Structures are given as structure tokens and as C-alpha cells.
């Protein structure tokens, strides 16, 4: 909620059977309070702090991957890694999520949710 404009989701395709990058391009002016790139990264980091399967890349890690994110980096895991790329001068940012669509995808989510509903360890049966 709170968006005046509908976000645009994009996916990357390539010659790999497993792994995925999903992107959400943002016009910073369209967000409440017109946050900067670091503010978005800080908000995501605070939200996912302590989450076992979700991590947010630091500015340095994001810079190291600016040329290319490998969709297969998280294969065979239940992990999801978030990156915030952006250009403060143009007021644009891209949120990128890196995941194994076969692990963190629907089957992994089903196991994780079942564990939570049954009061089991969230990671039971997951890689």
C-alpha cells in the first residue's frame, strides 16, 4: 500500500534451468518521503534483520555485483538475497532479488510455511 503508481516487476531469463533474478525498478520521487538509495537499503536491512533465509547486500557487496548478478549463485538453497542498485542523480533505483526458484520457490515456501504452522523449526527439511 501507499503507492500512487503501480510497481513494474521484471524477470531475467537466460540459459540456466535453476536460479532467478527478479527486479523492481523504482522512481524515487514516486515513493512516500522520496527516500534515497541508502534509506531503502537500511529499511530492508532492518526489516529482514535476523531472518534466517533473507539477507540484504551491503553497498559494497552491491557495488561488487553491479556489472552482473549470477542467478545461479543461490542454487540448492532456501536463501533470498536482496540488492538495492541506484543512481541518486537520476532518482532511480532497482531492487533485485536473487534466489533459487526451485528451492526458495513454491516448494520451499510450502515446506517453510508448513513448519511455521506446525510450530516446527522454520528450517526443518530445507537446505
Residue spans of the language-model regions?
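NAD(P)-dependent Rossmann-like dehydrogenase/reductase catalytic/cofactor-binding core
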Residues: 79-127
Amino acid at each position: 500500500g501507499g503507492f500512487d503508481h503501480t510497481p513494474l516487476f521484471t524477470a531475467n531469463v537466460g540459459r540456466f534451468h535453476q536460479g532467478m533474478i527478479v527486479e523492481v525498478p523504482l522512481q524515487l520521487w514516486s515513493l512516500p518521503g522520496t527516500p534515497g538509495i541508502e534509506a531503502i537499503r537500511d529499511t530492508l536491512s532492518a526489516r529482514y534483520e535476523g531472518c534466517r533465509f533473507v539477507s540484504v547486500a551491503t553497498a559494497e557487496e552491491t557495488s561488487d555485483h553491479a556489472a552482473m548478478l549470477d542467478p545461479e549463485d543461490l542454487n540448492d538453497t532456501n536463501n533470498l538475497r536482496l540488492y538495492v542498485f541506484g543512481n541518486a542523480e537520476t532518482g532511480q533505483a532497482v531492487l533485485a532479488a536473487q534466489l533459487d526458484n526451485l528451492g526458495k520457490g513454491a516448494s520451499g515456501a510450502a515446506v517453510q510455511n508448513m513448519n511455521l504452522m506446525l510450530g516446527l523449526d522454520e528450517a526443518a527439511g530445507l537446505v
